[in-house]
Amino acid sequence: MLTIGVLGLQGAVREHIRSIEACGSKGVVIKRPEQLDDIDGLILPGGESTTMRRLMDTYHFMEPLREFAAQGKPMFGTCAGLIILAKEIAGTDNAHLGLLNVVVERNSFGRQVDSFEADLTIKGLDEPFTGVFIRAPHILEAGEDVEVLCEHNGRIVAAKQGNFLGCSFHPELTDDHRVTELFVKMAEKHKQETAV
């Protein structure tokens, strides 16, 4: 069985686990770097990106996460997780993991009062998907090697590059698990390709 981890430092961890399990995979909360060895893919959940980065430093996650990515294992960043994955953050020189070749802007849809839901057309999904946006970032620029999966009002809100997937919204906060399933399929494909 495929095992997908959710970085359990803060954010909507339980909801992601529920969504992973609804897709028929095993969901594990990752609280220690050594747990990364036992999973096939990792979700970086929403939360607050600067707090998350501080916790990642405190618990010595940065280097193990880069090694995890270097092994080609899939990673999916949602909301603040997208900011953690991004190569560049607008208005600052301090990227976090710097893996997904995009420039993101934080809180670009406004503060918490501006949380909203929107029907999104996402590449790879037949029917619209309801995206829940909460203090969401968006992708200002995507590199040539990045596939844009979804735009909302002219702003990029989901993108994929190799084994990295990122989105501005919270796919785990609905009962529609198709976006999580896209990621599970990425992890499944990688596992099959690397099986000895």
Curated annotation (Swiss-Prot):
<dbReference type="GO" id="GO:0008614">
    <property type="term" value="P:pyridoxine metabolic process"/>
</dbReference>
<dbReference type="GO" id="GO:0006543">
    <property type="term" value="P:glutamine catabolic process"/>
</dbReference>
<dbReference type="GO" id="GO:0005829">
    <property type="term" value="C:cytosol"/>
</dbReference>
<comment type="function">
    <text>Catalyzes the hydrolysis of glutamine to glutamate and ammonia as part of the biosynthesis of pyridoxal 5'-phosphate. The resulting ammonia molecule is channeled to the active site of PdxS.</text>
</comment>
<feature type="active site" description="Charge relay system">
    <location>
        <position position="170"/>
    </location>
</feature>
<dbReference type="InterPro" id="IPR021196">
    <property type="entry name" value="PdxT/SNO_CS"/>
</dbReference>
<feature type="active site" description="Nucleophile">
    <location>
        <position position="79"/>
    </location>
</feature>
<keyword id="KW-0378">Hydrolase</keyword>
<protein>
    <recommendedName>
        <fullName>Pyridoxal 5'-phosphate synthase subunit PdxT</fullName>
        <ecNumber>4.3.3.6</ecNumber>
        <ecNumber>3.5.1.2</ecNumber>
    </recommendedName>
</protein>
<comment type="pathway">
    <text>Cofactor biosynthesis; pyridoxal 5'-phosphate biosynthesis.</text>
</comment>
<dbReference type="GO" id="GO:0042823">
    <property type="term" value="P:pyridoxal phosphate biosynthetic process"/>
</dbReference>
<feature type="binding site">
    <location>
        <begin position="47"/>
        <end position="49"/>
    </location>
    <ligand>
        <name>L-glutamine</name>
    </ligand>
</feature>
<comment type="subunit">
    <text>In the presence of PdxS, forms a dodecamer of heterodimers. Only shows activity in the heterodimer.</text>
</comment>
<comment type="similarity">
    <text>Belongs to the glutaminase PdxT/SNO family.</text>
</comment>
<dbReference type="InterPro" id="IPR002161">
    <property type="entry name" value="PdxT/SNO"/>
</dbReference>
<dbReference type="GO" id="GO:0004359">
    <property type="term" value="F:glutaminase activity"/>
</dbReference>
<keyword id="KW-0663">Pyridoxal phosphate</keyword>
<keyword id="KW-0315">Glutamine amidotransferase</keyword>
<keyword id="KW-0456">Lyase</keyword>
<feature type="binding site">
    <location>
        <position position="106"/>
    </location>
    <ligand>
        <name>L-glutamine</name>
    </ligand>
</feature>
<dbReference type="InterPro" id="IPR029062">
    <property type="entry name" value="Class_I_gatase-like"/>
</dbReference>
<dbReference type="GO" id="GO:0036381">
    <property type="term" value="F:pyridoxal 5'-phosphate synthase (glutamine hydrolysing) activity"/>
</dbReference>
<dbReference type="Pfam" id="PF01174">
    <property type="entry name" value="SNO"/>
</dbReference>
<feature type="binding site">
    <location>
        <begin position="134"/>
        <end position="135"/>
    </location>
    <ligand>
        <name>L-glutamine</name>
    </ligand>
</feature>
<feature type="active site" description="Charge relay system">
    <location>
        <position position="172"/>
    </location>
</feature>
<dbReference type="GO" id="GO:1903600">
    <property type="term" value="C:glutaminase complex"/>
</dbReference>
